[in-house]
C-alpha cells in the first residue's frame, strides 16, 4: 500500500499527466469518471477520480471541497485514503487508494465460507474506523454495506475500508447537525423526525449493518417508505427463527445497544469496542456458520445488479416522513476495481424473511435510496422499497 500520504495538495499548476499514467475506466458518475492509474516513478496502482468542473454547480464544488478536507484528516487502515489532489482549469482530480476487493457483500458471497466469528471481525474493523472518525470530529452520515469495501487479499482475514464521504460533516464539540440525509434502511430515527443529531446516527447505522451481516436481511422492512420509516420510529424489529437460531446472545445484545431510539442512550463507538462480543478473543471457538445469511446476500447482490437506482431526496416531517424523487447530484462514491462498481449506480435489494414464516423465501424488498433534505412537495410514499444505493 502507498505510504501515508505526503503528496496531498499539489500546486495548482502541477499536471497530473506528469505524475500518473491513466489506465482503464473503473467507474462513472454524474459528474466524474474514475480510472485506474499508475504512478510513473513508483509504479503504485491508484484510482483517479476526474470531476468535470463544467458540469457541477458552485454548491457541488463546495461539497467536493468539503469531502476532500474530510478525507485529508482521516488516516486509518480501515478508511479509504486520499493520496493527493490535482486542480486544473477543467477538472478536479482526486487520487485515491485503489481498492481491489470490491464491496464487502460481494466478497462474502464469493468466499462462501462465513461465520459469526467472521462477522464479528468485520464489525470490529468498522467500529474501530468510526471511533477514529468521531474522535477527529467527522460524522459519516451514510454508513451502509455499499460503502464498505474489501481490500484484503489474505483469505484468512478480510480488511474493510469505509468509503464515500460525500455526505460526511466535520463538527465541532457539542455541535448538533440538522440536515436530513442518509439511506432509508440505515437512517436513524432522529433524522426522520427532523431533530438535531450528532455522531450517534452513525452508531444506529452500524447496528443495522451488523444485523444484516449476521442474517443477510435488514431489521426494518416494508413495502413503502412511509411504512418503513414508521417501523424504524416504532423500533419494530426482532430476531426471527430460523435465521437467528444459534447466533450468540452477545451478538444480539450488541445490536440492541445500537438500535435504541434515544440517541443519548445509544452506545458510542468507544463503548462498542469494549462490548464483550467485539472484545472477547474468540480464538478457535466455533461459532455458527451463516449459510442462510450468504443465501440472502446472494439475493441482495443479484437484485441490486438487476436494477437501476434513482437518487431520492427526503422531505421528513415530525409526524410523517415523506420521500419524493428529485434530480440530484450524486455523492462522491466508493472506488473499487471490481466489476460491481463499474455502473453509475446500483440498486441493492435487502431480501427479508418474514418472521411469521421463516422458511418461506418470499422476501420484502427495502428501497435504500440516498436521501437528502429538500423543499420539493412531490410525495412518493407509495413507491416500492427497492434498495437504491449509489456507487460510482
Curated annotation (Swiss-Prot):
It comes from the Eukaryota. One of its GO terms (biological process) is signal transduction. SMART domains: S_TKc (SM00220). It catalyses: L-seryl-[myosin light chain] + ATP = O-phospho-L-seryl-[myosin light chain] + ADP + H(+); L-threonyl-[myosin light chain] + ATP = O-phospho-L-threonyl-[myosin light chain] + ADP + H(+). Pfam families: Pkinase (PF00069). Keywords: ATP-binding, Kinase, Nucleotide-binding, Serine/threonine-protein kinase, Transferase. Gene3D superfamilies: Phosphorylase Kinase, domain 1 (3.30.200.20), Transferase(Phosphotransferase) domain 1 (1.10.510.10). Residues 317-392 are annotated as: Disordered. One of its GO terms (cellular component) is cytoplasm. It comes from Dictyostelium discoideum (Social amoeba). Belongs to the protein kinase superfamily. CAMK Ser/Thr protein kinase family. CaMK subfamily. Residues 327-392 have a biased composition (Low complexity). The keyword Acyltransferase does not apply. Residues 317-326 have a biased composition (Polar residues). This is Probable myosin light chain kinase DDB_G0271550. Its EC number is 2.7.11.18. The keyword Membrane does not apply. The active site is at 142 (proton acceptor). The lineage of its organism: Eukaryota, Amoebozoa, Evosea, Eumycetozoa, Dictyostelia. Residues 20-278 form the Protein kinase domain. ATP binds at residues 26-34, 49.
Amino acid at each position: 500500500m502507498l505510504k501515508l500520504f505526503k503528496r496531498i495538495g499539489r500546486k495548482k499548476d502541477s499536471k497530473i499527466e506528469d505524475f500518473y499514467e491513466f489506465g482503464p475506466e473503473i467507474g462513472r458518475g454524474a459528474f466524474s469518471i474514475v480510472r485506474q492509474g499508475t504512478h510513473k516513478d513508483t509504479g503504485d496502482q491508484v484510482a483517479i477520480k476526474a470531476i468535470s468542473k463544467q458540469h457541477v454547480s458552485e454548491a457541488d464544488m463546495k461539497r467536493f471541497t468539503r469531502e476532500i478536507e474530510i478525507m485529508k484528516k482521516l488516516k486509518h487502515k480501515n478508511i479509504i485514503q486520499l493520496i493527493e489532489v490535482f486542480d486544473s482549469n477543467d477538472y478536479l482530480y482526486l487520487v485515491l487508494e485503489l481498492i481491489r476487493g470490491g464491496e464487502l457483500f460481494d466478497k462474502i458471497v464469493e468466499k462462501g465460507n462465513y461465520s459469526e466469528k467472521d462477522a464479528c471481525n468485520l464489525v470490529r474493523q468498522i467500529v474501530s474506523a468510526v471511533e477514529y472518525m468521531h474522535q477527529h470530529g467527522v460524522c459519516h452520515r451514510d454508513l451502509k454495506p455499499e460503502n464498505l469495501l474489501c481490500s484484503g487479499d489474505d483469505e484468512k482475514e478480510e480488511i474493510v475500508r469505509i468509503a464515500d464521504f460525500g455526505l460526511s460533516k466535520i463538527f465541532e464539540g457539542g455541535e448538533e447537525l440538522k440536515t436530513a440525509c442518509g439511506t432509508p434502511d440505515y437512517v436513524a430515527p432522529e433524522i426522520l423526525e427532523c431533530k438535531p443529531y450528532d455522531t450517534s446516527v452513525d452508531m444506529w447505522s452500524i447496528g443495522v449493518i451488523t444485523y444484516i451481516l449476521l442474517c443477510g436481511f435488514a431489521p426494518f422492512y416494508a413495502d413503502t417508505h412511509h411504512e418503513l420509516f414508521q417501523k424504524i420510529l416504532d423500533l419494530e424489529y426482532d430476531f426471527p427463527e430460523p435465521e437467528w437460531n444459534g447466533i450468540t446472545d452477545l451478538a444480539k445484545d450488541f445490536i440492541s445497544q445500537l438500535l435504541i431510539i434515544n440517541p443519548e442512550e445509544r452506545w458510542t463507538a468507544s463503548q462498542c469496542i469494549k462490548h464483550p462480543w467485539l472484545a472477547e478473543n474468540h480464538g478457535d471457538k466455533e461459532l455458527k456458520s451463516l449459510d442462510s445469511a450468504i443465501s440472502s446476500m446472494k439475493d441482495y447482490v443479484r437484485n441490486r445488479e438487476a436494477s437501476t437506482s434513482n437518487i431520492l431526496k427526503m422531505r421528513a416531517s415530525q409526524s410523517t416522513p415523506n420521500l419524493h424523487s428529485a434530480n440530484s447530484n450524486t455523492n462522491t462514491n466508493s472506488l473499487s476495481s471490481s466489476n460491481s462498481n463499474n455502473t453509475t449506480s446500483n440498486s441493492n435489494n435487502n431480501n427479508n424473511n418474514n418472521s411469521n414464516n421463516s422458511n418461506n423465501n418470499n422476501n420484502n424488498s427495502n428501497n435504500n435510496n440516498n436521501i437528502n433534505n429538500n423543499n420539493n412537495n412531490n410525495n412518493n410514499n407509495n413507491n416500492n422499497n427497492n434498495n437504491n444505493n449509489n456507487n460510482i
